[in-house]
Curated annotation (Swiss-Prot):
One Pfam family this sequence matches: EF-hand_7
Quaternary state and interactors: Interacts with MYO7B; the interaction mediates the association of CALML4 with the IMAC/intermicrovillar adhesion complex. Interacts with MYO7A.
Superkingdom assignment: Eukaryota
Molecular function terms from GO: calcium ion binding; myosin head/neck binding
Annotated protein name in UniProt: Calmodulin-like protein 4
Alphabetical list of PROSITE patterns matching this protein: EF_HAND_2
A GO CC term assigned to this protein in UniProt: microvillus
SUPFAM superfamilies: EF-hand
Domain EF-hand: 8-43, 44-79, 81-116, 117-152
Source organism: Mus musculus (Mouse)
Similarity comment: Belongs to the calmodulin family.
Summary of the function given for this chain in its UniProt record: As part of the intermicrovillar adhesion complex/IMAC plays a role in epithelial brush border differentiation, controlling microvilli organization and length. Acts as a light chain for MYO7B and is required for efficient targeting of the IMAC to the tips of border brush microvilli.
Amino acid sequence: MAKFLSQDQINEYKECFSLYDKQQRGKIKATDLLVSMRCLGASPTPGEVQRHLQTHGIDKNGELDFSTFLTIMHMQIKQEDPKKEILLAMLMADKEKKGYIMASELRSKLMKLGEKLTHKEVDDLFKEAGIEPNGQVKYDTFIQRITIPVRDY
């Protein structure tokens, strides 16, 4: 696992893992996996956590060691690639493969599909990404602008 994660990541994961290893036995409860993963910035759904546990043969009332925790974190982070997800969604909407989508069409999709956004949330997103309400939205520019990491103050 060390070849996939930096030493800093491993140290951060170990620190969080230790907080949930209440009996200092090198194990955490499976029921603590979701919250510990979210504390580390991952965004698993309860279903994804259940699948991770099943993959490793761990019952929902069982425990997992740090090595298994590292593997699960690596797999979760690897599958959470927002740029790739956004690009795939935009490509599905672009039937003619033009490389862009009209802002009005993007607004409609954001308000009707998946985790539906409100009109104001779409307005805020467009403002943040510098999109004109009636303009064209180029995939690469849009993805780059909305996936910029939040500055740490």
